[in-house]
């Protein structure tokens, strides 16, 4: 009897999981943005389009120009101007003329921050190490 209950629980969990998986792609993020922008779902990667919150990749896939979405770019300068990152990654599809803005932390940025550290802190860490 316990085996039958356990099998039923696994069956229900699997059916719910597959039902959710099928509806993920094009469904809005769950809130409207008529008067206020996507607030809670913005952390989940949602943006406002046509007064409904959609996932960013859905909006970007339907975009015709770079100006249709704040994360789309054609160069690194587009990302700087829009304030959405510092690196424009090109699309994997060769027929798509735009890319996606990312905030990239490279070794140059880390070195720049390291060079701004006061000299006293560097001496202190050397004393602690000895």
From Swiss-Prot:
Keywords: Disulfide bond, Knottin, Plant defense, Signal. Contains 3 disulfide bonds. This is a cyclic peptide. InterPro entries: Albumin_I_a, Cyclotide, Cyclotide_bracelet_CS, Cyclotide_sf. There is a cross-link at residues 26-56 (Cyclopeptide (Gly-Asn)). Transmembrane segments: none annotated. Residues 1-25 form the signal peptide. It comes from the Eukaryota. Belongs to the cyclotide family. Bracelet subfamily. The presence of a 'disulfide through disulfide knot' structurally defines this protein as a knottin. Probably participates in a plant defense mechanism. This is Cliotide T7. It comes from Clitoria ternatea.
